[in-house]
A protein has these predicted regions:
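Conserved beta-strand-loop-alpha-helix hinge in the C-terminal portion
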Residues: 95-117
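ABC transporter nucleotide-binding domains
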Residues: 1-73, 78-92, 97-98
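Compositionally biased, intrinsically disordered low-complexity regions enriched in proline and serine
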Residues: 25, 117-118
Length: 121
């Protein structure tokens, strides 16, 4: 019940998964991942294909979950990183090429997208 409330699925709980929007399907995935109270939550492209409202809701939900758990987020949507993450690790060809707090990027005024392309090209 707590997970249903946390993921805002209460009104959708009686629907079949195929009846849900992409955003609610993402929420169901998060709820399923949270059932066994993992210490670490691994999310692969959790904001892909969401409409603007769903995007904000899922971002906020991930940030809220991140207050109590380690959340590893895999994404190719560079603009999402500073909106969700407090640390960035860039992996290129199986090797870590960057491992830094987002605060450092912000203080130094680094353009994350350009930095990513420089490290991975």
């Amino acid at each position: 019940e707590d997970i249903i409330e946390k993921t805002n699925l209460k009104l959708e709980r009686s629907k079949k998964i195929e009846q849900l929007s992409k955003g609610y399907k993402q929420r169901v995935g998060l709820a399923a991942a949270l059932i066994h109270t993992p210490d670490i939550l691994i999310l692969d492209e959790p904001t892909t294909g969401l409409d603007p409202n769903q995007l904000v809701e899922i971002r906020n939900l991930i940030k809220e979950i991140g207050k109590n758990k380690i959340v590893l987020l895999s994404t190719h949507i560079i603009q999402e990183i500073p909106k969700i993450c407090n640390k960035i690790i860039i992996i290129n060809k199986g090797k870590i090429v960057e491992n830094r707090d987002m605060d450092e990027f912000n203080k130094q005024g680094v353009n994350l997208e350009n930095h990513f392309h420089r490290l991975t090209s």
